[in-house]
Structure formats: C-alpha cells, structure tokens
C-alpha cells in the first residue's frame, strides 16, 4: 500500500479480518514472508520501537476495544494524550470537529455501555482519524449498514489521502464494492484465505 492510497477489501469473515489487521500492525505473527510499515519489518523491531511506530496508525476495531470504566470521550483522547505532544485544547478541538463531521452533537460523555451502537460506531471512526495518522485500518466501520456514515467516512479518508496517508478498509457490503463514488485505488476480495483482485462484474 503506497502513500495516498485507499484499498477496499471485501470479506464477510469478521474474525479473520481482525487477525489480518493485527498482522498488518505487527500484533500477530505471520507464517510466511514479512510485513513492513514505513520500511520497518515488524518482526525485527523491539517492543518499544513497534509501539512508537503504531502511534502513526488509526484503527476501527471490530469489537470496539473500549475501556468500559472510562467515558467514550476519555477513550478517544487518552491514547493521544499519552503518545503525542499535541496540546490538550488542540486535541479536544480536533476531536469535537470530527464528532460534528460524523453527526454527533459533541464528544460522548457516557460510558461505552450506555452509548447507542450507532454512536459508538461514529466514536470509533473519530478515534481512528484523530491525530493525523499515516495509516488507517478500518474493520467494517459501517457494520450496521448505516449509509449516513459513508459520507463523513469518505471525507475523513480523503483528508488522510491528501496528506499522503493510506487507508485499508474491510467491508462486508457488496454495494460498497461496486460504488464508484468510493475512489479506491485497489479493490480486493478474500476467498479461501487468499487475496484476489475484485472483478467489476461481481
């Protein structure tokens, strides 16, 4: 995946896609070959070096990965508070701007368990795009089929691409694969654990 590219991948196996996303980020071993990010082979990095490199990655995870004892807002802000030098006010402003883009009135103050599923999906997208990531991995960000999420999602994706970041998007929706309004550089499908080019007549 080159800087500025969007790769769209069709697969209905959500668990396998999460394992694949983990492997892309050096969080799961690969049996053959290697995976590099910004020229670095994950397998050759120390734990600290790998953690530093992952600071440049945003991700929407299938299971949400929420800390249940912290508000959704704290879940969004804590990683960047710990891993970047972005001033607190700038961080809050950026998060609030993304919240408005994704159709939320503000940053959710409830605990994750008290939030509606649709709001949590939007919050997961906010977290993934917050902080100018160099790579964004989206695991089924519109799992519920929420079409209202696609427009702000595409706006955020295009913003990442304009600053030469890359996006890998897993989807289980056939309609998205054939949607030419999504300017993907590559379209793929996963079949029998193999990655295949997407045929336009599918």
Regions found by a protein language model. Give the residues of each.
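Conserved ABC nucleotide-binding domain
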Residues: 98-116
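Conserved catalytic loops of ABC-family nucleotide-binding domains
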Residues: 156-177
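ABC ATPase nucleotide-binding domain signature
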Residues: 12-13, 56-66, 70
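Conserved ABC transporter NBD signature motif
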Residues: 33-43, 139
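ABC ATPase C-loop
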Residues: 128-129
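Helix-to-loop junction immediately C-terminal to a conserved catalytic motif
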Residues: 25
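Q-loop/switch helix immediately C-terminal to the Walker
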Residues: 63, 69-82, 94
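ABC ATPase NBD coupling module
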Residues: 42-58
């Amino acid at each position: 995946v080159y800087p500025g590219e969007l790769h769209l991948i069709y697969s209905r196996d959500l668990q396998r896609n999460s394992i694949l996303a983990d492997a892309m980020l050096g969080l799961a071993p690969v049996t053959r070959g290697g995976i590099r990010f910004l020229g670095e082979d994950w397998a050759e990095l120390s734990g600290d070096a790998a953690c530093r490199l992952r600071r440049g990655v945003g991700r929407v995870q299938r299971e949400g990965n929420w800390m249940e004892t912290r508000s959704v807002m704290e879940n969004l802000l804590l990683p960047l508070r710990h891993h970047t030098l972005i001033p607190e006010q700038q961080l809050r402003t950026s998060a609030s701007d993304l919240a408005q883009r994704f159709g939320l009135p503000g940053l959710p103050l409830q605990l994750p368990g008290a939030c509606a599923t649709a709001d949590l999906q939007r919050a997961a997208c906010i977290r993934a795009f917050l902080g100018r990531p160099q790579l964004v991995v989206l695991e089924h960000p519109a799992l519920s089929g929420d079409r209202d999420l696609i427009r702000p999602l595409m706006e955020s994706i295009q913003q990442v691409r304009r600053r030469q970041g890359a996006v890998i998007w897993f989807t289980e929706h056939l309609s998205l694969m054939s949607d030419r309004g999504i300017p993907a550089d590559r379209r793929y499908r996963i079949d029998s654990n193999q990655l295949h080019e997407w045929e336009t007549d599918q």
